């Protein structure tokens, strides 16, 4: 499966556009990680645990995007965009949302 952020694949011809595919990954907050990240925010520095979480989430979202594209008969996904956001859940915390979107295509 070819996955790319571009709208074309060099050397390939798009035979058919199969539709938009979207995949979401949601992570719940973790009290200890959030507490330690808050301390780092105050004293400065990077929060490695959140960086790793974002990296993992992006990989998972792209993997799910590939699976959904394969179900449509695609062998490539073009124009991939990854968005991140948070969802506030009352007083209990925040959910991290990572969304990947692209166009499933059949190429030769």
From Swiss-Prot:
<dbReference type="Pfam" id="PF01906">
    <property type="entry name" value="YbjQ_1"/>
</dbReference>
<dbReference type="InterPro" id="IPR035439">
    <property type="entry name" value="UPF0145_dom_sf"/>
</dbReference>
<comment type="similarity">
    <text>Belongs to the UPF0145 family.</text>
</comment>
<dbReference type="InterPro" id="IPR002765">
    <property type="entry name" value="UPF0145_YbjQ-like"/>
</dbReference>
<protein>
    <recommendedName>
        <fullName>UPF0145 protein Ava_0420</fullName>
    </recommendedName>
</protein>
């Amino acid at each position: 499966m070819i996955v790319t952020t571009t709208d074309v694949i060099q050397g390939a011809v798009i035979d058919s556009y199969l539709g938009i595919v979207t995949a979401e990954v949601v992570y719940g907050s973790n009290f200890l990680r959030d507490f330690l990240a808050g301390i780092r925010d105050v004293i400065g520095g990077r929060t490695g645990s959140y960086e790793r979480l974002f990296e993992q989430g992006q990989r998972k979202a792209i993997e799910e995007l590939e699976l959904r594209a394969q179900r449509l008969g695609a062998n490539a996904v073009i124009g991939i965009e990854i968005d991140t956001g948070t969802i506030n859940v009352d007083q209990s915390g925040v959910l991290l949302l990572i969304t990947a979107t692209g166009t499933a295509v059949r190429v030769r």
